[in-house]
Amino acid sequence: MLFNKYDVNAVEIHDPGMVKYINVKSALNLHTGGRFSSYYAGKINMNVVERLINKLMRSEKWTGKKYSAYKITEEAFQIIAEKTKQNPLQILINAIENAGPREEVTRLKYGGIAVPKSVDVSPSRRVDEALRNIATGATNASFKSKKSIVNCLADEIMAAARNDPTSFAISKKEEIERVAQSAR
């Protein structure tokens, strides 16, 4: 159970490449305290909701305030459950699958000239990019706005799950893929 309300066993991950990298195992406490940081690719052992909470703590206002980010996420999940009548964890998984870019650009040097080259994105980076863009979109939408961060996070997750281009995460993904397509 997540937040003692939502069933984690009912969640399905549709993207076969991301199954290994999205951890939805039940956790009593979404605070590992960096337990997996010393392991290679240890972040795949962390619950995806805790990773979202950690991404919310990136901006200046929320830096280091894990309990505040925890409450924001919990209240956003309540709003998602009320509006969609579905498991909010499933909505988050759908949002991550939709918001993760499939290809991006890297720079190669050929004889002193930097040339952009399109490359595939690893599944773990897709999850990281999706979570980062969802959290960034929510904090940007709530900055100097009457809407609270809770409502902005819920709206961002639901819009990304619908693959709505008004979502910051989806628009960022499309921008990255468009640039990569031009660099083929």
Swiss-Prot record:
One MF term in the entry's GO annotations: rRNA binding
Gene Ontology annotations of biological process type: translation
The keyword Ribosomal protein is annotated on this UniProt entry: yes
Stored Pfam families: Ribosomal_S7 (PF00177)
Superkingdom classification of source: Archaea
GO cellular component term, pick one: small ribosomal subunit
CDD domains attached to this UniProt entry: uS7_Eukaryote
Keyword Ribonucleoprotein carried by entry: yes
Entry keyword set: Ribonucleoprotein, Ribosomal protein, RNA-binding, rRNA-binding
Alphabetical list of NCBIfam families matching this protein: PRK04027.1, uS7_euk_arch
Job of this protein: One of the primary rRNA binding proteins, it binds directly to 16S rRNA where it nucleates assembly of the head domain of the 30S subunit. Is located at the subunit interface close to the decoding center.
Subunit structure comment from the entry: Part of the 30S ribosomal subunit.
Family per record: Belongs to the universal ribosomal protein uS7 family.
The protein's name: Small ribosomal subunit protein uS7
Species of origin: Thermoplasma acidophilum (strain ATCC 25905 / DSM 1728 / JCM 9062 / NBRC 15155 / AMRC-C165)
